[in-house]
């Protein structure tokens, strides 16, 4: 009976680790996708995301969006290549989402600078929060990172 319980526990641990690894990859892909979009098509991002009265569509605004996107690509690359522990998931989930929720609320709903397209950013931030919490729960008690 104990060997069956041990096998079941080992299977549960392996499944949790696979899920955590998949979540880490999804987190990285969100950063890489949205960041890459800013790098490769800053004019499109500016046109879709900013209300007309705030659009500049200048080389400077394109450069700023590309810098923003490059930082997201860097974070996505690091997330993809790094090994996450439970604490990494938790800290990443909180730091990669909570400050940006404040940003989204302020600039989408309070100052109304952004269009509804900016809800893609909000969805990305929500995914970071959920992935961080779920990854943390899956990896609690694990000593080997994924």
Predicted regions mapped to residue ranges:
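Cytosolic juxtamembrane helix and N-cap/initiation of the first transmembrane helix
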Residues: 2-34
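Interfacial loop at the N-terminal end of multi-pass membrane proteins
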Residues: 7-17, 44-62
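Juxtamembrane helix-break-helix junctions at the cytosolic face
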Residues: 13, 76-91
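Transmembrane alpha-helix/helix-exit interface in multi-pass inner-membrane proteins
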Residues: 28-47
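Core segments of alpha-helical transmembrane spans in multipass integral membrane proteins
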Residues: 32-34, 59-81, 95-98
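Hydrophobic alpha-helical membrane segments
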Residues: 90-106, 126-131
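Membrane-helix boundary connector in multi-pass membrane proteins
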Residues: 102-120
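Membrane-water interface at the C-terminal end of transmembrane alpha helices
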Residues: 126-146
């Amino acid at each position: 009976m104990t060997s069956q319980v041990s096998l079941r526990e080992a299977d549960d641990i392996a499944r949790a680790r696979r899920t955590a690894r998949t979540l880490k990859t999804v987190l990285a892909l969100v950063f890489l996708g949205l960041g890459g979009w800013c790098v490769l098509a800053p004019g499109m991002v500016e046109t879709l995301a900013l209300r007309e009265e705030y659009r500049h569509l200048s080389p400077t605004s394109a450069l700023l969006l590309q810098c923003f996107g490059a930082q997201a690509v860097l974070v996505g690359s690091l997330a993809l290549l790094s090994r996450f522990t439970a604490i990494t998931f938790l800290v990443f989930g909180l730091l990669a989402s909570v400050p940006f929720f404040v940003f989204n609320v302020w600039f989408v709903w309070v100052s109304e600078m952004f269009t509804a397209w900016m809800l893609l950013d909000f969805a990305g931030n929500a995914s970071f929060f959920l992935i961080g919490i779920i990854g943390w729960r899956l990896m609690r008690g694990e000593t080997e990172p994924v």
